[in-house]
């Protein structure tokens, strides 16, 4: 993750909204191309172009927010010897992509909405991979904290 290869510069609020609108248009165009009955006054070629632009906007949006995922996952990655930093980062990226699918740019900045979801998914992932299957994520975090404190007290 050093330097985050492929990461693009952060988006301004205006760029974020513009990309989100392009993504929405691309999703709608893809739905029409897939046979959903929506009334549009566009040719197949125009719909294909709009769908491609939507996919490019989605990719740019995700790449521009990789630093957000790195920021959120840095607090969790590396604490558990069972789960690697790369695994935690990948889970964070998957969570970010999920948030983007339901993101409504009219309701605020992406980071405000995405950070809690990414953090929750990463914590749940680490808890489930750290040998605590079946334990709720918040309880796994508490157990981990208690074990860490107990180990520190024993070493003193």
Predicted regions and their residues:
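Alpha-helical promoter-recognition and RNA polymerase-docking modules of transcription initiation factors
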Residues: 1-134, 138-152
């Amino acid at each position: 993750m050093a330097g985050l290869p492929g990461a693009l510069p952060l988006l301004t609020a205006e760029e974020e909204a513009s990309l989100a609108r392009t993504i929405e248009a691309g999703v709608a165009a893809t739905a029409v191309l897939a046979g959903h009955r929506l009334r549009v006054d566009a040719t197949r070629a125009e719909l294909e172009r709009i769908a491609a632009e939507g996919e490019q906007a989605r990719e740019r949006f995700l790449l521009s927010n990789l630093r957000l995922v790195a920021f959120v996952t840095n607090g969790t990655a590396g604490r558990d010897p069972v789960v690697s930093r790369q695994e935690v980062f990948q889970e964070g990226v998957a969570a970010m992509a999920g948030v983007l699918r339901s993101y409504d740019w009219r309701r605020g900045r992406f980071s405000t909405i995405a950070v809690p979801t990414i953090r929750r998914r990463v914590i749940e992932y680490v808890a489930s991979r750290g040998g605590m299957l079946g334990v709720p994520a918040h309880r796994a975090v508490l157990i981990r904290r208690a074990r860490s404190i107990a180990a520190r007290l024993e070493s003193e």
